Amino acid sequence: MLPERHIGAVNWVGLGTLYGKECRRFFKVWLQTIVAPTITSMLFLAVFALAIGRVMPEIGGVSFLQFMAPGLIVMAMMQNSFANTSSSLMISKVQGNVVDVLMPPLSPGELLIGFAMGGMSRGLVVALVLSLVMLPFVHLEVHHFGFLLVHALGASLMLSLMGLLTAIWAEKFDQLAAVTNFIITTLAFLSGTFYSIERLPEPLLTASQFNPFFYLIDGFRYGMIGHADGSLAVGAAVVVGCVVVMWLICLKILIKGYRLKA
């Protein structure tokens, strides 16, 4: 007879198992989850370098490619953090094995941490690999490590939570694809990834300042090249506020079991 196992305030074994499952899931298909987004981002860099890289003036005292590189890194990080949590939970729901995650003695908070950390890990791994691949072509440096780290963690965590929230809400892959294509991709492309928002006319300039993705990219860019288009204090407040709000929403939904429990 197996001895009785006592679980403390936190089920560390269960939490570690869930996190490990999420990480093994994307490492198992690394060509799709790590190499593919890296190649896509490098293609963006190559196209812009060949098309307008030499004729574009410096932005913030750096070349256009140096300005664009941090934006591409954060965009890849955000998209892959979102994809990891959303696809993992969505596939479990569609295949009917989400019960394997819900039945173990894991609290809603532990489920949230496990899924969110898995998404963050994929986003950060993609960002690291992409940065290393970019090094021979673009001069990358760290201007302010604190801003770089905070906005990298904030971007990956925010999009992990958004992915989890989307997967809970969606009932089929069409709905998940709609959010990915019309919300995540749109906000990422209109957040100053490829341009400085200072070049935008009104009212597009004002509208960009209501895009939370802009502050993620702007803060990360400042941490890397020392240039920011917006207020760093406002950006940090927006990032923290969005993460806290989304965390509380996800936790509340997991507690209620909305669209997860019969």
What are these regions (language model features)?
Residues M1-A262:
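Hydrophobic transmembrane alpha-helices and immediately adjacent juxtamembrane helices
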